Amino acid sequence: MSRLSTALQLTDIDDFITPSQICIKPVQIDKARSKTGAKIKIKGDSCFEESESGNLKLNKVDISLQDCLACSGCITSAEEVLITQQSQEELLKVLQENSKNKASEDWDNVRTIVITLATQPILSLAHRYQIGVEDAARHLNGYFRSLGADYVLSTKVADDIALLECRQEFVDRYRENENLTMLSSSCPGWVCYAEKTHGNFILPYVSTTRSPQQIMGVLVKQILADKINVPASRIYHVTVMPCYDKKLEASREDFFSKANNSRDVDCVITSVEVEQLLSEAQRPLSQYDLFDLDWPWSNVRPEFMVWAHEKTLSGGYAEHIFKFAAKHIFNEDLTTELEFKQLRNRDFREIILKQNGKTVLKFAIANGFRNIQNLVQKLKREKLSNYHFVEVMACPSGCINGGAQIRPTTGQHVRELTRKLEELYHNLPRSEPENSLTKHIYNDFLDGFQTDKSYEVLHTRYHDVVSDLSISLNINW
């Protein structure tokens, strides 16, 4: 199974990176010099064959995600390349070591284990095990607690804050007429593609607001750490996400705190990896104890544990920001549900606000890399300037159909599965981001809304990764 989105895959990659040596950590092959030269062949059994030297068994290349991010050539895909520190095996290793340290009362090496659940994996696992969404969240808490987790949280508060920051960023850009079209930034597959393929041309248009995963990292490693009086470096923060590209995002150097000597997110596992863990345990999710998700942020718990944000399936950015901008820029209070018009396909839709016959707001949703490529080309030809904001997601249908969501059963089409997950999502209660908790977090921990501190911890930067033009990156659509 592919571990990263289609846009970040290198085609025809093998466990053993060949002597073309595109990777920055190549296999080192020592061989004697020959005046006559030699023929080289990588065989199917992983041997490096040279006609004069016989066969040499190659070692596997151990490449970390940070190596990939530092490389200007490719983003390596897949289980063939060993992704260290970002796997269910690493999580189990940490949990087992932590249990041993607790048993031996080695308190200096005991870590607080925090698990954060995104909404889409909860829906995927609820459908897989045929249980209600709220019960799926409770059973997941029971499962992770059985492994030794200390806290199991949802991303709700981070989702709320991401919308608050992104909508204000858009209004500021619109009023200043600066760097429009604004492009969403919560999808790491899209962001990495933008950095490596289009660089400084496209990056000024990308929203600087951190994704909910990385905002959650700040909340856990700073606010929760203060509340429970544990240093950030002693907290092991795991997120459960709908796509493998979130592993890349968590590994960015921008999200490593030198002050805390800690990453905001230490490990990312995915819906399908949780399913694999449950399968290996030979115990379905429904057989684990039911515990409400933890809510360490305030004394008042929300009525529900799993929430939707607007109608769209990837965080609700386009819909929420459109309504906010209509009200705060044009004094239009849009109380009815928004209807996006389908254009070329169901993954490219737009919505328009008109005043006095003139278009004043024009938003779009672009899912899937075919639409993203068309989007970028239009921007390059200056034909996209009439869009003010575009919600961009690498996966067709958005995060609900993330690359690491549980796959359809035999005989089931992916669209049928996606439709069922969409139904589950649309039946969730809607969160209103501007609430008492987000106000509390801004006022008590971030020095208020739109302050230097809030900008520092809730926004990020992007980097133009200069590619070697001799390297051909073949993207499969």
From Swiss-Prot:
GO molecular-function terms, A-Z: 4 iron, 4 sulfur cluster binding; metal ion binding
Signal peptide: none
Record-listed [4Fe-4S] cluster 2 binding positions: 187, 243, 395, 399
Binding site for [4Fe-4S] cluster 1: 23, 68, 71, 74
UniProt cross-references to Pfam families, sorted A to Z: Fe_hyd_lg_C
InterPro entries, A to Z: Cytosolic_Fe-S_CAF (IPR050340), Fe_hydrogenase (IPR009016), Fe_hydrogenase_lsu_C (IPR004108), Fe_hydrogenase_ssu (IPR003149)
Keywords: 4Fe-4S, Iron, Iron-sulfur, Metal-binding
GO terms (BP aspect): iron-sulfur cluster assembly
SMART domains: Fe_hyd_SSU
Domain of life: Eukaryota
SUPFAM superfamilies for the chain: Fe-only hydrogenase
Family of this protein: Belongs to the NARF family.
Function: Component of the cytosolic iron-sulfur (Fe/S) protein assembly machinery. Required for maturation of extramitochondrial Fe/S proteins.
Name recorded for this polypeptide: Probable cytosolic Fe-S cluster assembly factor GD17698
